[in-house]
């Protein structure tokens, strides 16, 4: 089977990896019943990742003739006698309009139909979303016969949702277990204090016999055995108190002393830290040259971007700066959108790798949303009008998750900045997100 490059502009590239079979046609019938059969239409359509009915219908629309594709037999017929070269030329136009990305030219696109019945091509190679000219005749046929939706993305998000629920249940179970252990430790520490107090009293009295020393601990053992009958699951406290040797009692005294001294050290060190924080706040966060103000951080991020830093390299450099996490994220957003006056959605798509690296840690999605809010709410910022598009782009790129977006939106409506226009501009995307969530739950 002879192969050719997909797209007329790539016909001379010997190393082009996107290929399709050369078209083979056959004239059938006579007189008024003459038809042109595109023999290998199914193979061509598979390489283009488009239904064969689309290409067949396109031939009919452009030639002004009836066309039919039989799904059962896989045959493609166009009424009339047509040369192979003519049909191949029409196929190239179809590829340019409905297959190739308008941005990078690669044929790795997927047809999307929006709620407004508009057709878009989403490129898997560069992420660019191309708007198809809806004046073409074939667009009506595509809207009425949409391609089969891949359930991969929905299944992926459903799996993520299930995984989050599982993690939440696990965290709740861990919290309950920690509470139980704390209660056991409190009981153990109180009984241990009683035991150590009695042992010190016995030492002062000079009772040197081992039996006198061990007599109070026997009573503790009996109390612990009764507690064990009530709760068989908590074994740690019982084992800790059953050891009544001299070394064990000394170890318990050391642990109690170390805990008390640790509290004393923490109390003494807290005050200087508070003073340092207060002084740094008064000086604008630039005390002794160990921390930097916000403007300096933004300038450094911009300089690193100009140097060609990658996402991981830039984020590792940013993480080392002695500034709060929210300021780092705000500086990153401001630097990435520098010089952008329009097309914030496209710019977000281009810089998605940086945003994805920035939200790698838990809780960082909320920081990114606050940074976007801060950037959009600046005076004379055109990004405020496109905030919904920015959120949609980050959501489609799996940078932001629906839970974080909805949580940020709901808190914003009740916060100090509730009168900002950002919430009104973001509302269409939030409504779409919640409707899509309810539809997926119903399915």
From Swiss-Prot:
Ranges annotated as biased composition (Basic residues): 179-188
InterPro entries, sorted: ARM-type_fold, IF2/IF5, Transl_init_fac_IF2/IF5_dom, Transl_init_fac_IF2/IF5_N, Transl_init_fac_IF2/IF5_Zn-bd, W2_domain
Basic and acidic residues bias spans: 147-178, 207-227
GO biological process: formation of cytoplasmic translation initiation complex
Keyword Protein biosynthesis applies: yes
Chain intervals for the UniProt region annotation (Disordered): 147-244, 271-293
GO cellular component: cytosol
Low complexity compositional bias, start-end: 280-291
Amino acids binding GTP: 29-36
CDD domains assigned to the protein according to its UniProt record, in alphabetical order: W2_eIF5
Family annotation (Gene3D superfamilies): 1.25.40.180, 2.20.25.350, 3.30.30.170
Keywords: GTP-binding, Initiation factor, Nucleotide-binding, Protein biosynthesis
Alphabetical list of SUPFAM superfamilies matching this protein: ARM repeat (SSF48371), Translation initiation factor 2 beta, aIF2beta, N-terminal domain (SSF100966), Zinc-binding domain of translation initiation factor 2 beta (SSF75689)
Single GO term (MF): translation initiation factor activity
Pfam families: eIF-5_eIF-2B, W2
Domain annotation W2: ranges: 284-443
Comp. bias regions, Acidic residues: 228-237
Protein role: Catalyzes the hydrolysis of GTP bound to the 40S ribosomal initiation complex (40S.mRNA.Met-tRNA[F].eIF-2.GTP) with the subsequent joining of a 60S ribosomal subunit resulting in the release of eIF-2 and the guanine nucleotide. The subsequent joining of a 60S ribosomal subunit results in the formation of a functional 80S initiation complex (80S.mRNA.Met-tRNA[F]).
Family: Belongs to the eIF-2-beta/eIF-5 family.
Protein name per the record: Eukaryotic translation initiation factor 5
